[in-house]
Amino acid sequence: SLSSAISPSSYAAIAAAYSARTPIFNKKKTAAVLSPLSLFHQSPSLSKTGIFLHRGRKESSSKFYIAASVTTAVPSLDDSVEKVHLPRGAMWSIHKFGGTCVGSSERIRNVAEIVVEDDSERKLVVVSAMSKVTDMMYDLIYKAQSRDDSYESALDAVMEKHKLTAFDLLDEDDLARFLTRLQHDVITLKAMLRAIYIAGHATESFSDFVVGHGELWSAQLLSFVIRKNGGDCNWMDTRDVLVVNPAGSNQVDPDYLESEKRLEKWFSSNQCQTIVATGFIASTPQNIPTTLKRDGSDFSAAIMGALLRAGQVTIWTDVNGVYSADPRKVSEAVVLKTLSYQEAWEMSYFGANVLHPRTINPVMRYDIPIVIRNIFNLSAPGTMICRESVGETEDGLKLESHVKGFATIDNLALINVEGTGMAGVPGTATAIFGAVKDVGANVIMISQASSEHSICFAVPESEVKAVAKALEARFRQALDAGRLSQVANNPNCSILATVGQKMASTPGVSATLFNALAKANINVRAIAQGCTEYNITVVLSREDCVRALKAVHSRFYLSRTTIAVGIVGPGLIGATLLDQLRDQAAILKENSKIDLRVMGITGSRTMLLSETGIDLSRWREVQKEKGQTAGLEKFVQHVRGNHFIPSTVIVDCTADSEVASHYHDWLCRGIHVITPNKKANSGPLDQYLKLRALQRRSYTHYFYEATVVAGLPIITTLQGLLETGDKILRIEGIFSGTLSYIFNNFKSTTPFSEVVSEAKAAGYTEPDPRDDLAGTDVARKVIILARGSGLKLELSDIPVQSLVPEPLRGIASAEEFLLQLPQFDSDMTRKREDAENAGEVLRYVGVVDAVNQKGVVELKRYKKEHPFAQLSGSDNINAFTTERYNKQPPIIRGPGAGAEVTAGGVFSDILRLASYLGAPS
């Protein structure tokens, strides 16, 4: 009913507006009238005979009420019309087109073409109002009850929208018929809105009656166009057929038996091959117009499918189907080929844009499949929702886990009721959720410890204060007595649901899920899983929700291991690494399911960023064209957070101590670090120890194999020996490729200075050869190995024998140094000759003496048959003397310098990281 207190003087306005029993709605099979009704103090009950306003004074008073109701006249069949049996079964194809699909004349033509081209024997088409019209109709009601005079012009705008569409679509006769009906409807609506304006209030039945006109008009327009295209078509006002009963707030239950009877009657008078039915609207058993509430048009299509036992219900939208995750949050979400009814229900409950759960119920009764398709991409097959789903990806590969999709709900709070007094006490849960019910809150998820010590549940954040207050009041005595320890609420939470019908029969799904979350450094606050195992639900921090969604989706839907890579320092080693990644990327993805995405490359001046992955075949050109000013923090934030990949690694290919100083922070943020940069591991001991301790207690990894001898597996061998219980006694090796080359070529015919110049010309030395000859680089490698062996040494604790003559250490330029170096050849020649006379050679080595807790870098003599004397070129060599390998130390030998092998060592660390993150070994 529509009721509002008005004064007697206001009645003149009503009487002027409405004459006694004036018809205000005259349309096929629907009647409504306004008539004076008695005015009285008590709000009257709903009239069942039409829309009436009755006037009459019950007693003297300054306040009166207007009462009105809306009813739909149910069509009665003429006895002379022979009853026709309504065929049911798979010959019926149901289509539903939303407001976007019929948003313009061109789109209505497109819909009509789709319907006509459907070769089904019989078709029923459910349509929504044109795009934005439903909102416009609600706005009319809001303006009218707010006594905003602009409601009339707003209604004229709605009429004009439909008139222009009709002019574009219809021929003369059809146009005249439609415009006549439209004009009658608008007159009716103006009268009703005027009544709402005067009363200052609109009841639900009045609102439903007004809003439903959008569907009436779009259905008529589409039916005219289908007939124009040669289709045998009638339109149906579903208020004449669908009967629903209110079922609580914002819900209705279909009355299938009564609806079937009315559908039979309607079809007897309207036999046709194609029916265009209004979505969203229906009637109550008292014939009062109502709506099907949220997602009502989808619900209409599902109900009609059930009434007709249709072969299929197709929901036409503006997306290609149901996605494995929200594509706005996960850019690589895929369209699912199939979903089971249960999977679709679970995903929609947890916020996925699939269907409202109630839409699925009618079709489930008769195993009618629902297909979600894109009207703007007819080539896309869409998603089929049916009894059984198929666990396939787009390329036909079976999903190992049978997980179909992921959905999230944000803006939740987690309430925890905890206490030892809960255990074994019957009725505790009833009391808790009774208090929640009393404040009208909605519980989204429940989790209870098996010890009965605590119950936690999630509610909308907007309701958490009321719930917490109600619980504290309900359990005040238990809290004061200590039987309950707390009623705590944790705001800023989100729910992540993992859905799949076949998860119950697939071992390891939960393990895979939580492993993915752990490796993305995400903390889970609560867990819930039903015995059917259709979904696994976790509660986590809202700020982690999108990252968690990306992490689990990546684990189940992308390559087995997908890693975001950020390259710092695209110099000689960095550029070579990028080339190696480019050449190997496709092979790794195909054979090992490892997907390495370079999301950013930064130098000291410019950086190149990408949302989906840089094309490594032309990164140099793109960086020149689109590079932006370098900023290390912005670079890291982008690589870490601006994409769909959960695991991130920063590869530092510089020799910069400033970059190395960020490693600890990156590891704290869940970013893995790989580097050939020696500065962090050979820097201050306390910083090194903090770095190593952080790595051990977190799920982040710090790999630095290439810091000692490029790509040779020195670090991993050392760690393997220690982890298996061996004890390091001594590590000795030639760790400089430059100095290895120099002493391998320092023979009787060539002075030392000449060999140094040759090494520089060949690219083996640093721009200033003194950086190599000073031995500092070797000392850094020795300190890295010493610390890796458990020795707590500083770089200053390592004595280093410099090969740079004392007088030449202060010379400004490298060129001047090389010019003066020959003056000191005699000293090196004498050392070489002394060694040769003893059957030995000179080698520049680093030594870790673990027994005596020290290290040294020095020029040392070795017998010619010693492995260290057998080197050639720039090879490096290392020998581990341990308790197990004491008499015959294992030796690792190979190239120890050069961009290719150093980049290869870094690449090997990246693949080791991928293996740790789940890639097959």
UniProtKB/Swiss-Prot annotation:
Point out the coiled-coil segments of this chain. Answer: none
Which cofactors are reported in the record for this sequence?
Answer: a metal cation
Homoserine dehydrogenase: region residues = 568-921
Q: What is its EC number?
A: 2.7.2.4, 1.1.1.3
Instruction: Select a single GO molecular function from the record's annotations and give it.
Output: ATP binding
Which residues participate in Na(+) binding? 705, 708, 710, 712
Q: In which pathway does it act?
A: Amino-acid biosynthesis; L-lysine biosynthesis via DAP pathway; (S)-tetrahydrodipicolinate from L-aspartate: step 1/4; Amino-acid biosynthesis; L-methionine biosynthesis via de novo pathway; L-homoserine from L-aspartate: step 1/3; Amino-acid biosynthesis; L-methionine biosynthesis via de novo pathway; L-homoserine from L-aspartate: step 3/3; Amino-acid biosynthesis; L-threonine biosynthesis; L-threonine from L-aspartate: step 1/5
Q: Which GO terms describe its biological process?
A: homoserine biosynthetic process; lysine biosynthetic process via diaminopimelate; methionine biosynthetic process; threonine biosynthetic process
Give yes or no: UniProt keyword Nucleus.
no
Write the record's keywords in alphabetical order, separated by commas.
Answer: Amino-acid biosynthesis, ATP-binding, Chloroplast, Kinase, Lysine biosynthesis, Metal-binding, Methionine biosynthesis, Multifunctional enzyme, NAD, NADP, Nucleotide-binding, Oxidoreductase, Plastid, Repeat, Sodium, Threonine biosynthesis, Transferase, Transit peptide
Name the major location. plastid
Q: Which PROSITE patterns match?
A: ACT, ASPARTOKINASE, HOMOSER_DHGENASE
Name its cellular compartments: Plastid, Chloroplast
Q: Which InterPro entries match?
A: AceGlu_kinase-like_sf, ACT-like_dom_sf, ACT_Aspartokinase, ACT_dom, AK-HSDH_N, Asp/Glu/Uridylate_kinase, Asp/hSer_DH_NAD-bd, Asp_kinase
Report if keyword Hydrolase is assigned: no
In this chain, NADPH is annotated as bound at 573, 654, 678, 898
Instruction: Write out the catalysed reaction.
Output: L-homoserine + NADP(+) = L-aspartate 4-semialdehyde + NADPH + H(+); L-homoserine + NAD(+) = L-aspartate 4-semialdehyde + NADH + H(+); L-aspartate + ATP = 4-phospho-L-aspartate + ADP
In terms of NCBIfam families, this protein maps to:
asp_kinases, PRK09436.1, PRK09466.1
- This protein is called Bifunctional aspartokinase/homoserine dehydrogenase, chloroplastic
